[in-house]
Amino acid sequence: DYIHSLGLKFGIYSSPGPTTCGDYLGSYQHEEIDARTWGRWGVDYLKYDHCGYHAVQKDSEEKTIREPYIVMRDALDKVDRDIVYCVGYGAPNVWNWAREAGGELWRTTRDITDEWNVVTAIGCFQDVCAQATAPGNYNDPDMLVVGKLGKAWREKVHESALTPDEQYSHISLWCILSAPLLIGCDMSDIDDFTLSLLTNNEVIAVNQDLLATPATKLLTDNGQIWYKKLYDGSYAVGFFQIDPYFILWDQDEAEAI
């Protein structure tokens, strides 16, 4: 109730295995009791991470990896509460089966860090899975690495290593992708710049557009252009200099899109 009174959602993390990534207890063979407990607590969001499942996994076939996610989906469906279900990354091409396993969103790549080469590698890969995006079903390229962050495995909290321009590009691309906008920073200590990034109504409107149209990537000789059609018939277009070159914009080519 306290979390909800602040206007926030209550998210929780678990694994289909006996343990989680952090070596805490997972939900293996306790799916229904965990789902009921989360419902009673008022949980709004579940990230169900593949970590730990390797200990009991029979093989690496897609069917085997998908199975425990279906078990948890069935358990959540028995709870009298809507809990958004994120299928954690655990297999190649997760976007091909996560929807059928009951996920509303699914992690598409490795964990993100606040390094520009990692952000661009993850973001620019999303055209491979873009067609899986639809209203209520979303590719998740991982959280936004803005603000004060802690690196993996509890390392010291620090300011994002991304430059301001890199952060603009990071959030802009995630919005064009209709990606979930999850922040991993310290919410009690957000600076004005980070707050301005996270509260830009025009950019958020692109992310939240009702159509959730899959984004399209166009390659140029010296950059990338991403675009998607919006509900009102207009287009959101993003220009991204992944490498230190200029992008040349031709209005005739733009109208041909």
Q: Residue spans of the language-model regions?
A:
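Glycan-recognition surfaces
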Residues: 30-33, 82-186
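Generic recognition of short, well-ordered alpha-helical segments
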Residues: 60-63, 67, 97, 249
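Flexible loop/turn segments at secondary-structure boundaries
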Residues: 18-21, 54-56, 92-95, 153, ...
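Carbohydrate-binding surface patches
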Residues: 168, 174-177, 182-184, 219-257
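Active-site-adjacent structural elements in folded domains
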Residues: 21-23, 31-33, 157-161, 219-224
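Substrate-binding cleft of carbohydrate-active enzyme catalytic domains
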Residues: 1-57, 61, 68, 72-73, ...
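Residues that form ligand- and interface-recognition hot spots within folded domains
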Residues: 14-16, 89-91, 241
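Catalytic cores of secreted or luminal carbohydrate-active enzymes
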Residues: 169-218
